[in-house]
């Protein structure tokens, strides 16, 4: 089995992408698997991507981080400043990308998880559907698309089904759901 690939779309300054990396790394270790994964974070803002690549955050932006997470995944680099440890930073690649205008996708491989939270809300309903269809083309055949709750209402991408629980808005291909192989 190859590595797990995750795309954090609209990742801003990287907090979401690094949180996904921490979550995936922990889940793989808890499952007794060697953590083999990569996270790709994309955003339209060059400044945000520059900051994401640095991986340095103020304590005030990390209020939900517990002591164990600080110890395992961050180094203190100044007063109230923390940097994501190099091992984790190496697993996360950040790219400047505009999903509306990029003709050839920067994401070359099929993704197992596409995480797109709070980005679609800025688009009209028809454009949201168009973008979601575009994103599904980047999914591995057993992949999962996770959207912000309420970003896509009363519509499901063709060939996909919503995954339980209803507290999240996630979709996977119908064949995958029927076979019980969802991520």
Predicted regions: what they are:
Residues 141-149:
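Conserved beta-strand signature within the Rossmann-like core of class I S-adenosyl-L-methionine
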Residues 13-31:
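Conserved SAM-binding loop of SAM-dependent methyltransferases across substrates and taxa
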Residues 1-4, 33-34:
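Short helix-loop-beta connector
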Residues 129-141:
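A short glycine-rich, Lys/Arg-flanked "PGG" loop and its adjoining helix->strand segment in the class I
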Residues 9, 30-115, 119-127, 152-154:
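Extended basic-aromatic, gly/pro-enriched interface segments that bind polyanionic ligands
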Residues 113, 155-183:
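Core SAM-dependent methyltransferase catalytic element
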Residues 3-14, 40:
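Conserved class I S-adenosyl-L-methionine
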